[in-house]
């Protein structure tokens, strides 16, 4: 079974809570919560208040918080207090990586690092033993509905091999253009977690879409 983390950026915001409950009831083990600052990426999404509201309504859910922001260090505590289970930030951010990892862990959250399509996975090497998750972006971050980049598969394979070599325990997540066609390729390459937005919330039957992905 594959872990499915539906990207709620693609949900219907007029019924966000109901959409989240629907995918959780269908078997999604996480909710992928994209935070964008309009600086690190050109788009702006949601922040601490929306997460706090979701957590209030669904306190048992796993909130996979993806910080597509230039300065994640300043938000380690606010997002932890709002209900983040895991805070996942970009290797390409402007803050000190080690300091940010330490700050997130100090708040009691799991920690992940993300790499954009132009970043080699080897750049993560100094931090892999400290991580709970590594996210490989298979599109340029910032907007949903982009086409999957096949080069991400080789990154997943390298990270899977490096994890085995180190006997590390981080999970491998892939995000961007994940659908019924690309998801099996990602799982074969080593992905433990599939982030899917349009493929879930844009499907005629989102619950069935979650179940299909989870069955891979």
Which residues fall in each region the model found?
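Short secondary-structure boundary segments
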Residues: 35, 91, 115-117, 138-139, ...
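Conserved beta-strand segments that form the floor/walls of ligand-binding pockets within enzyme
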Residues: 3, 114, 135-138, 173, ...
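Active-site/ligand-binding-proximal alpha/beta "capping" segment
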Residues: 140, 147-193
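Conserved N-terminal beta1-alpha1 strand-loop-helix module at the mouth
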Residues: 1-88, 94-96, 103-106, 110-111, ...
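Acidic, Mg2+-coordinating phosphoryl-transfer loop and its flanking beta/alpha structural elements
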Residues: 191-196, 201-202
